Amino acid sequence: MDDIDYIDDINEDSINHMLSTLANVRDPEFSATISLMQEVLKIINSRIIEIDKKYKKNNRNINSMNNASSRVSY
């Protein structure tokens, strides 16, 4: 795991913890807003993961095609 990934994970965990704490505030409107923010962040995060998986899959396919073409002898 890269240091950068580790830092991103810590920041994501910190933000999630902060939002969870703020969602327990007694003001129902504020709490609802924070809960909505949490859901939006979950959707964004899942979309980023989906895009990252597609990128890695496409990258592997391109690399395997490049490797196959380099093995062709004339």
UniProtKB/Swiss-Prot annotation:
Assembly, per entry: Interacts with protein G7; the interaction stabilizes both proteins.
PTM note: Phosphorylated by viral F10 kinase.
Magnesium keyword on record: no
Role noted for this protein: Required for the association between the dense viroplasm and the viral membranes to form the mature virion (MV).
Family in the record: Belongs to the chordopoxvirinae A30 family.
Organism: Fowlpox virus (strain NVSL) (FPV)
Protein name listed in UniProt: Protein A30 homolog
InterPro entries assigned to the protein according to its UniProt record, in alphabetical order: Chordopox_A30L
Record key words, sorted: Phosphoprotein
